């Protein structure tokens, strides 16, 4: 989410460009901040789906879980980019303060019993057991 915009800044280090894209980063960060909810493991977007795979629940393919690593990874990345942009541009405010509090509270990446990153909030059986994620 906005990563391609921020990567252009990282490549060029053009502060004028960063100033131009900052409102986009900020509004996306605000949206994601408002979507986060408390779970027993931390903050997450609830519910969520994996964009490419489903898991089995009582033999049925299910696309929706409590939360997904894909969603949380995107938000973690966005929040880090936004906070870095705030520092570069010397823009601190209520939202950056909220994001600073929320970022470390987002559910950490979970590993399964076989060492793989869990796609969902639990170690479910995947519909596509040979799916390409590691």
Model-assigned labels for residue ranges:
Residues 1-11, 15, 19, 23, ...:
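Active-site core of glycosidic bond-cleaving carbohydrate-active enzymes
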Residues 27-85:
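Acidic/histidine-rich catalytic neighborhood
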């Amino acid at each position: 989410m906005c990563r391609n915009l921020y990567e252009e800044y990282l490549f060029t280090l053009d502060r004028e460009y960063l100033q131009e894209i900052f409102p986009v980063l900020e509004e996306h960060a605000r949206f994601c901040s408002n979507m986060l909810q408390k779970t027993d493991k931390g903050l997450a977007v609830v519910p969520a789906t994996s964009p490419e795979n489903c898991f089995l629940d009582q033999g049925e393919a299910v696309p929706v879980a409590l939360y997904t690593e894909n969603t949380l990874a995107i938000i973690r990345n966005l929040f880090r980019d936004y906070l870095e942009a705030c520092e570069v541009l010397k823009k601190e405010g209520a939202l950056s303060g909220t994001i600073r509090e929320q970022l470390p509270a987002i559910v950490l990446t979970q590993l399964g019993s076989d060492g793989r990153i869990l796609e969902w909030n639990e170690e479910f059986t995947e519909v596509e057991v040979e799916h390409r994620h590691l």
